[in-house]
Amino acid sequence: MKKICIVPFTKNEYSLIEFLPPEYVITSLITPMGIGIEGQDISVMRNSSDIGYQFTNSITNGINNADTIIVTNIEITEKKLYEYAFQALLMAVKLGKDIICFLPLNDDEKEVIRKMCECFGGMCQFIKPLTPSHVDKDAKVQLYNFHVPVIYISEMYTNCGGYEALIRIAEAIRCKGYKPLVLSNNPYNILLKYHSINFNDVTSLENSVVEINQAVYLLSCKVNPDIIIVHLPNPVMQYNRQNRFDCGVLSHVISQAVPGNGYLYCSLKTKDFRFLKAITDTIEKKLDCPLIGVWIGNQILDPASSSGTSLVNLPADNISIQSQTDSLSIYNAFSIIDQNSLVSCIIDNFLNLSYGVI
């Protein structure tokens, strides 16, 4: 087993530690004191499920006690936290550690790190998602067809439970003996032995459908899956005037490149089921595929956020929902029974039937 340390640890790595393969044993989760990204630091994980780990702000102790160091994906625009991550990377290199680096670095910086690893006896693996714009495209083929069912995971708001739903469903389906092709723009997908694809990285909007289609097709040829599950990178619809995201443009492009057979909608906590029915009906038309159900977690918009874009968790035991209402299938993200019911629904409706035969 590999003893690993994750630095810097933020909300974005929460699902990573829950689903890491058994060969990894976490020894340290390092989070800096007084440095963070609003809405992403560990304070917003209050009322999350217990994970059984303690946080530390000591880079030295955390890295010393681990065999493998995971340096997380921090955007360069988050200057202080990025510098913290880079300093942790340099320390790990000088201690001769094995490093899995998700930190965005340019080619010159990567070369410097490689040479330092040679000097200090360590090794650094730089992780980058697949980019459709870099796939060798077959000019003779416009679009490939997919002969297995395709399911989308869509969200009401960015990072409101879609990635957790994706991995839970994928793991459950895999345990049932099926082979899923799991696609997300989350770079940590690679650590979980799935695939990461940067849907935003296309040469142009007019080429985006073909480029994404061919990138996913090449992955499907490699994996030979029973089902394709795609985590849509942006919400299909704007949340409000302040949070428009991309107004569903990228999700529409993906739906044209990899046509879906059904979608799961991940919602913020709400009891307004009429609103959910209206919005899911609209998304159904935008994605051109039926709703499988609504996955409701315990997150709401943080009323104390200065940016108005952060989420906060409510106590999970406050979630009280009906499983069926207004012709919607509702699934509680914290209910094992509901999760099993959702997976059974997907298997019965998409995998147990002879696909494409009526």
Task: Go through the PLM ranges and name each one.
Residues 22, 26, 36-60, 172-251, ...:
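ATP-dependent carboxylate-amine ligase catalytic core
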Residues 5, 68-72, 152, 227-229, ...:
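Structural motif
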Residues 136-184, 276:
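Walker A (P-loop) phosphate-binding motif
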Residues 101-102, 153-161, 202-206:
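Flexible, glycine/proline-enriched loop segments at strand-loop-helix junctions
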Residues 73-81, 235-240, 259-275:
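Conserved Switch II/interswitch segment of TRAFAC-class P-loop GTPases
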Residues 118-140:
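N-terminal pre-Walker A segment at the start of P-loop NTPase domains
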Residues 89-95, 253-259, 284-288:
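Short, conserved loop/helix-junction motifs that constitute active-site signature segments
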Residues 1-126, 295-358:
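Long, basic/Gly/Ser/Thr-rich N-terminal segments
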